[in-house]
C-alpha cells in the first residue's frame, strides 16, 4: 500500500489500523521554531474523537496524542515530527461474524481483491479511525498558518439529510454537537437523529470548509493547482463522494455575466470561484464543500456475499456513526490546512523574491 503520504514540502504520512495497537504519523517539512505542545493538537482531536455525543459512535477513545520526535523545549526543530495515538477501546469480537463476509458499501471486497487479504476488524486501514492522525497533523499546520500568516480555517456541517442551514453563524459551530451554524435547526436535527437511530439506518451530509487570510499566489499550475490539490485531499477523506470549490456544480446554471467575480482595487464583488483563479489563490477566502455518503454499517438487513461467493443477507454489528458527517468537520479542516501549508512552503521556495507592479486587490 503506497498511498499513505500527502504533500511535497509539508509531507504527512500516516500508519495504523482501526483495531491495531496504535495510530501514528510522521510530519516532514515543518519549519523550525514553531511553538508546539500536545494541547495544540488535542483540541481538534477532541472535536473528532468518538463517543463524545449520542449522535456518534459509542466507541470511546481518549485519542491522547504523544509527541515522539521533532520537538525540543516546546519548539519544532525542523526534523521529522513523530506522533502517536494508542487504541484503547477495540472490541474486535464485534466483527468476528464478518471475517468471511463482505459488508455492502464498505471497502471489504475491494481490499480483499486488491491485496488478497484484509483486516476485517473495524475495516482495518480503511476505517475513518485513521483520520485521527490527519487531524493531529492538520492542527500543526493550522497553528503555523495562523501564527505566521494569519490564515484561519473554519468548517461546519452545512446539511444533514434533508435539514440544511439557512443562516451561517460561525459563533454557533462550537456550541452544539453537530458543528451546525444555524441554531434554529438544532431541535429538528436532534429529532431527526433520534428517529434515525430507532430505524437502524444512517444518513449523508454536506460540510463546508473555508480558509480566510490566504495570500495571493498559492498553487502550482498546471497539475498541482491549488483547487486540484484541495479536491485531492478532501476526496481522500473516508465516505466523501463529492467535492466542490466555490459554487461547484452550481456554475452549470450560471451565465458568464453572473459568475465572473467582478473586481476593483477595493475588492472582488463576489466569490463564486471559491478563492482560486487559474489554480492560484486570489486572496479571497478559499471555500470548499464535500458530500459524505451515509454510513454503510447499519442494522437494516441487506444482501451481500461471502469470501467463497455465497449470497447471504446480513446486518452489520458493531459501534458506528449514524452520520459520519458530524465528526468529519475537523477532518476537513485538517486536510485543507495541510494543503495550504504545503503550498505556502512551495510558493516560498520558488517565488518569495517575486514582485508585481499590480496592486493587491483589497477585501470588501
Curated annotation (Swiss-Prot):
Q: Which GO terms describe its biological process?
A: amino acid biosynthetic process; aromatic amino acid family biosynthetic process; chorismate biosynthetic process
Residues binding FMN: 125-127, 238-239, 278, 293-297, 319
Note the CDD domains from the entry: Chorismate_synthase (cd07304)
What name has this protein been given in UniProt? Chorismate synthase
Name the coenzymes or cofactors required: FMNH2
Q: Which GO terms describe its cellular component?
A: cytosol
**To which pathway does this protein belong?**
Metabolic intermediate biosynthesis; chorismate biosynthesis; chorismate from D-erythrose 4-phosphate and phosphoenolpyruvate: step 7/7
Keywords, alphabetical: Amino-acid biosynthesis, Aromatic amino acid biosynthesis, FAD, Flavoprotein, FMN, Lyase, NADP
Question: How many cofactor units bind, and how?
Answer: Reduced FMN (FMNH(2)).
Q: What's the catalysed reaction?
A: 5-O-(1-carboxyvinyl)-3-phosphoshikimate = chorismate + phosphate
> What's the superkingdom here?
Bacteria
**Which family does this protein fall into?**
Belongs to the chorismate synthase family.
Drop me one GO molecular function for this one. Answer: chorismate synthase activity
- Quaternary assembly: Homotetramer.
Q: What class of enzyme is it?
A: lyase
Q: Which residues of the sequence carry a binding annotation for NADP(+)?
A: 48, 54
| Species name | Shewanella frigidimarina (strain NCIMB 400)
Q: According to the UniProt entry, what is the EC number of this protein?
A: 4.2.3.5
What function does the entry list?
Answer: This reaction introduces a second double bond into the aromatic ring system.
Pfam families with a match to the protein in the record? Chorismate_synt
Amino acid at each position: 500500500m503506497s498511498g499513505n503520504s500527502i504533500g511535497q514540502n509539508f509531507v504527512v504520512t500516516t500508519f495504523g489500523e482501526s483495531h491495531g495497537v496504535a495510530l501514528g504519523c510522521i510530519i516532514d517539512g515543518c519549519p523550525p521554531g514553531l511553538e508546539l505542545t500536545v494541547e495544540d493538537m488535542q483540541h481538534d482531536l477532541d472535536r473528532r474523537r468518538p463517543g463524545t455525543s449520542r449522535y456518534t459512535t459509542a466507541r470511546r477513545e481518549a485519542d491522547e496524542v504523544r509527541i515522539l520526535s521533532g520537538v525540543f523545549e516546546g519548539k519544532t526543530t525542523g526534523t521529522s515530527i513523530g506522533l502517536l495515538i494508542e487504541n484503547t477501546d477495540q472490541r474486535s469480537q464485534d466483527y468476528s461474524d464478518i471475517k468471511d463476509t463482505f459488508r455492502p458499501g464498505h471497502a471489504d471486497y475491494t481490499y480483499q481483491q486488491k491485496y488478497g487479504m484484509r483486516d476485517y476488524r473495524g475495516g482495518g486501514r480503511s476505517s475513518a479511525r485513521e483520520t485521527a492522525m490527519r487531524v493531529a497533523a492538520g492542527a500543526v499546520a493550522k497553528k503555523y498558518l495562523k501564527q505566521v500568516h494569519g490564515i484561519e480555517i473554519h468548517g461546519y456541517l452545512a446539511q444533514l439529510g434533508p435539514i440544511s442551514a439557512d443562516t451561517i453563524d460561525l459563533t454557533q459551530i462550537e456550541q452544539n454537537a453537530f458543528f451546525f451554524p444555524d441554531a434554529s435547526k438544532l431541535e429538528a436535527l436532534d429529532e431527526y437523529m433520534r428517529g434515525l437511530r430507532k430505524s437502524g439506518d444512517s444518513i449523508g451530509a454536506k460540510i463546508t470548509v473555508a480558509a480566510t487570510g490566504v495570500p495571493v499566489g498559492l498553487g502550482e499550475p498546471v497539475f498541482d493547482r491549488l483547487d486540484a490539490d484541495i479536491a485531492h485531499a478532501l476526496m481522500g477523506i473516508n465516505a466523501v463522494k463529492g467535492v466542490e470549490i466555490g459554487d461547484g456544480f452550481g456554475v452549470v446554471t450560471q451565465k458568464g455575466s453572473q459568475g465572473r467575480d467582478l473586481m476593483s482595487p477595493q475588492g472582488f464583488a463576489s466569490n463564486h470561484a471559491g478563492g482560486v483563479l487559474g489554480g492560484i489563490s486570489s486572496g479571497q477566502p478559499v471555500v470548499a464543500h464535500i458530500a459524505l455518503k451515509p454510513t454503510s454499517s447499519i442494522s437494516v438487513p441487506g444482501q451481500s456475499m461471502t469470501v467463497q461467493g455465497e449470497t447471504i443477507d446480513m446486518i452489520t454489528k458493531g459501534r458506528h456513526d449514524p452520520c459520519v458527517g458530524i465528526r468529519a468537520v475537523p477532518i476537513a479542516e485538517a486536510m485543507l490546512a495541510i494543503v495550504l501549508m504545503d503550498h505556502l512552503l512551495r510558493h516560498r521556495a520558488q517565488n518569495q523574491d517575486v514582485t508585481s507592479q499590480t496592486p493587491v486587490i483589497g477585501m470588501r
